[in-house]
């Protein structure tokens, strides 16, 4: 098992390096592969990596992109989705908007005291599905996780007095059972650290129907919880190393940050101490 895991990690590392050779990024010393072969080699390495994974029972890497509403998670996922060896899973928002004809997300924003528990129960279910579905690539990048659903959004409802303690306890019991009995582990959290003010401006510009009534106070509360959880690490146990990327900048600078951190993001096995 250990031998297969080590081989898997090495192959993933080479896949990431080869994928970069056609870009302006510097090549590793002695690494001279014609650009025309890059894509073929990446596909070959990915195929071999998956084969090693299946034969040796190795677990592939799961990277979760975390951050406030409108912090830039979709932009991050879209950027790395261009990498051949990555499976990208966005938040299942469409499911939350249409549960057999019911828009749970919209109902929650309209009356969180009434619909908070209903939405968060369904979110926990759909995020569990995201974590446990079979992996089709060596790397899976997820938009948020079952961990942030509980530690950020459920916690916010409870702290703000919009979720009764009994509902909070039931969701906590479910979450603890899930984490003990299913594999929802994470190898790396990429935290897009963004000010509530920036998120609020982006929120207004993207004009999503359900988000029109989101107040600055809500974004500030979510930001505070993320800071407690991932930066101060005083809220709940953090399930993996954390890589912090400042995401208040304009689009071009943020993309430059992604490129600067590409190797650290795509080889999470090497991330021992990110903070």
Task: Give names to the regions the model predicted.
Residues 150-225:
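A glycine- and Lys/Arg-enriched "phosphate-lid" helix/loop adjacent to the NTP-binding pocket
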Residues 2-15, 19-22, 26-27, 41-61:
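Extreme N-terminal, non-catalytic leader segments
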Residues 65:
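Hydrophobic anchor at the beta1->P-loop junction of P-loop NTPases
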Residues 73:
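Conserved lysine of the Walker
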Residues 82-126, 153-154:
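Conserved substrate/cofactor phosphate-moiety recognition/catalytic segment
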Residues 76, 80:
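Hydrophobic positions on the alpha1 helix immediately C-terminal to the Walker A/P-loop
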Residues 68:
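P-loop (Walker A) phosphate-binding loop of NTP-binding proteins
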